[in-house]
């Protein structure tokens, strides 16, 4: 009786919410928030948070793994930035703050080669005008560059802005072995895109140097035009990490 009931319930469940294996489809159809993708027409009240028709979630995410041996110095540098301007990280608090998690090393080819701390920062990005700088734009850019360039942080492969992936593949000792395996298993490049070719260093470049490229994370500024000079944001050295080049609001 119990087995029959379970079979009946399973069959009913599959007919309602499951269409069978394999589970293949567009990413926006695989990942959902409850039933928001298939909800009734109700003025978009139950739309998914990422639905472009509504003013839903829209932000940048910087997610980087800092080697455990460098974490103390990295945090102290961030503290030094906050000491200069205590309000500089308030934008992070509007979202999730700074999420931190421990990760261990792995034998995988594109692995964390040593124990590390993952830092996840979620912050504002204008939906209407992608070239609009954020409040305290320079502080966020400096933290990002500090982690990548000074402390040799590794980017989360599924997050981050373009500049985080510039040269990232070279930080992995077994990158060439991975690429050989990739070529052997996928010689036709069916699982490759222009973007994956760029971040794996196979073709093209992830950075795009043009007017206004820095606020969008397409480049590290080297000229005022890469920021938003018409809105007072100029390319300047970092405040703590002097080698950084960030878009700073110049008021005088």
From Swiss-Prot:
<dbReference type="InterPro" id="IPR007173">
    <property type="entry name" value="ALO_C"/>
</dbReference>
<dbReference type="GO" id="GO:0005739">
    <property type="term" value="C:mitochondrion"/>
</dbReference>
<dbReference type="Pfam" id="PF22906">
    <property type="entry name" value="GULLO2-like_3rd"/>
</dbReference>
<keyword id="KW-0560">Oxidoreductase</keyword>
<comment type="function">
    <text>May be involved in the biosynthesis of ascorbic acid.</text>
</comment>
<keyword id="KW-0060">Ascorbate biosynthesis</keyword>
<dbReference type="GO" id="GO:0003885">
    <property type="term" value="F:D-arabinono-1,4-lactone oxidase activity"/>
</dbReference>
<feature type="transit peptide" description="Mitochondrion">
    <location>
        <begin position="1"/>
        <end position="102"/>
    </location>
</feature>
<dbReference type="GO" id="GO:0019853">
    <property type="term" value="P:L-ascorbic acid biosynthetic process"/>
</dbReference>
<dbReference type="InterPro" id="IPR010030">
    <property type="entry name" value="GULO_Plant"/>
</dbReference>
<comment type="similarity">
    <text>Belongs to the oxygen-dependent FAD-linked oxidoreductase family.</text>
</comment>
<dbReference type="GO" id="GO:0050105">
    <property type="term" value="F:L-gulonolactone oxidase activity"/>
</dbReference>
<comment type="pathway">
    <text>Cofactor biosynthesis; L-ascorbate biosynthesis.</text>
</comment>
<keyword id="KW-0809">Transit peptide</keyword>
<keyword id="KW-0496">Mitochondrion</keyword>
<protein>
    <recommendedName>
        <fullName>Probable truncated L-gulonolactone oxidase 7, mitochondrial</fullName>
        <ecNumber>1.1.3.8</ecNumber>
    </recommendedName>
</protein>
<dbReference type="GO" id="GO:0016020">
    <property type="term" value="C:membrane"/>
</dbReference>
<dbReference type="InterPro" id="IPR055154">
    <property type="entry name" value="GULLO2-like_C"/>
</dbReference>
<dbReference type="Pfam" id="PF04030">
    <property type="entry name" value="ALO"/>
</dbReference>
<dbReference type="InterPro" id="IPR050432">
    <property type="entry name" value="FAD-linked_Oxidoreductases_BP"/>
</dbReference>
């Amino acid at each position: 009786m119990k087995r029959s009931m379970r079979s009946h319930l399973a069959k009913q469940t599959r007919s309602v919410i499951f269409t069978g294996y394999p589970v293949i489809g567009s990413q926006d159809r695989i990942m959902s928030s409850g039933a928001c993708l298939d909800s009734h027409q109700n003025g978009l009240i139950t739309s998914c948070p990422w639905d472009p028709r509504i003013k839903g979630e829209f932000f940048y995410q910087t997610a980087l793994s800092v080697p455990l041996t460098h974490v103390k110095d990295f945090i102290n540098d961030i503290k030094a930035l906050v000491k200069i301007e205590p309000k500089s990280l308030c934008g992070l608090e509007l979202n999730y703050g700074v999420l931190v998690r421990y990760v261990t090393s792995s034998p995988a080819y594109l692995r964390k080669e040593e124990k590390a701390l993952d830092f996840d920062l979620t912050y504002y990005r204008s939906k209407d005008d992608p070239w609009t700088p954020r409040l305290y734009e320079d502080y966020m850019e400096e933290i990002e560059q500090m982690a990548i360039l000074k402390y040799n942080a590794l980017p989360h492969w599924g997050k981050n802005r373009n500049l985080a992936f510039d040269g990232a593949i070279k930080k992995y000792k077994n990158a060439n072995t991975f690429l050989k395996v990739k070529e052997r298993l996928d010689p036709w490049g069916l699982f490759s895109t222009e973007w994956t070719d760029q971040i794996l260093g196979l073709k093209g470049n992830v950075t795009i140097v043009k007017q206004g490229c820095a606020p969008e994370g397409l480049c590290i500024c080297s000229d005022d035009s890469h920021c938003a000079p018409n809105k007072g944001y100029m390319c300047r050295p970092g405040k703590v990490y002097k080698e950084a080049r960030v878009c700073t609001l110049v008021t005088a």
